[in-house]
Amino acid sequence: MKGLITTALAVLLLAGCAGHQTPAFSPTLDEVFATRRSIRAYEAGRTISEAEVRELLTATQNAPSWANQQPSNYYVAIGAEKREAVLELIGGNKERVINAPVFIVSTFERGKSGFFRGTPTDATGDFWGAYDNGLSNAYLILKARAMGFDTLIMGMRDADALRALFAIPDNETVLAVIALGYRAQDPATPAHRPLDEIAKFF
């Protein structure tokens, strides 16, 4: 009888421990905004699957764009060979992101956003494409944070070499390379301009 009681207590203890496991990372939208940072040091040895990157990029399909033109495209370096090649094309950022397991090249198709039948609708022209790509990238990095990942958007890149590496069509502008991984440390919260400085109410 004593043995049965001991066994029963052990089972209850294990069940209780199982019910108190650390919950999965599931932040609120405000927590995503508050914890997203441009990360310049990544944990080594950690991986991100293609399925996870696909889920991440699916979020960009919900980003708004000029007349729903959806000019943004992404080229994902997830294999070792392409990843190593990208590292050589991002200048001084190489050492900052050397442990990031994935790099995403962000482009937009010129002549789509801001154009009607091949003619720009206003003086903004292809800047609308860059604007839309920025919106799409914002969705990407926020979704990444919601999934527990971290990012760094890098403008320092050899666009011509990246175009050749990924066979990017000539009608696309290579805008940025985004590192994707896990932060090695929590950076300090940077100073932000006061709301009353950036917003005017009338």
Predicted segments with their positions:
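Acidic, surface-exposed loops and disordered segments
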Residues: 17-202
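Bacterial N-terminal signal peptides
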Residues: 6-15
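Positively charged n-region of N-terminal signal peptides that target proteins for export
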Residues: 1-4
